[in-house]
Amino acid sequence: TYPDPASRDPHAVRTVLNLSELDIRAGEILGIRGHNGSGKSTLLRIIALLEPPDNGTLLFEGRPAGTEDLHLRRQVTLLLQTPYLLSRSVASNVAYGLRVRGISSASELQNRIAASLLAVGLDPAVFLHRRRHELSGGECQRVALAARLALRPRVLLMDEPTASVDQQSAERIARAARHAADSGSAVVVVSHDHEWITPLSDRLVTLREGKLVE
């Protein structure tokens, strides 16, 4: 629930998400569609352990999970609609999260960076040393996705990943999502692009006013 700006009562709240149960499975792509304000992004933030639900429990492999569980939060990664990249090389951007997680071996960093770039359709020989200003919008999104794939997350969340990219990048992002699922990650994709998300998803649900309608 959030404060309701449409109400004159300063204490009034609006329920933006009201789910009884939703399973997310390893090795599967769960597609979530819905109009703006339907609760899609709120759901992703709860799954990403960025904010707690007001009621109910989020379970990870049968155990309660909370925002204070830093170990679990490192196993979940979120790709936003508008990617944020450092003003550095592509290699540095992909390596950043790996270094934060304590991976310092030069060979492992090199292998993970190369593999994740290939997974999103970017040739390391061409893109490794390019900087943010040398990339198109679609390439920036693919680099941001590569940085998350390099972490080998248990859960990969994607919030409108193709909203501002070209057709080629949208296709590459779909392939990368499938690769992540085939590698064992649970993948959750939010999109209002029905033509893109429908063939991609193993399961497809619709949110309407915070509730699952199908």
What is each PLM-predicted segment?
Residues P64-T77, D182:
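ABC ATPase NBD coupling module
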Residues L156-D159:
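Catalytic Walker B motif of ABC-type/P-loop ATPase nucleotide-binding domains
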Residues Q167-S169:
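Helix N-cap at the start of a conserved alpha-helix in ABC-type nucleotide-binding domains
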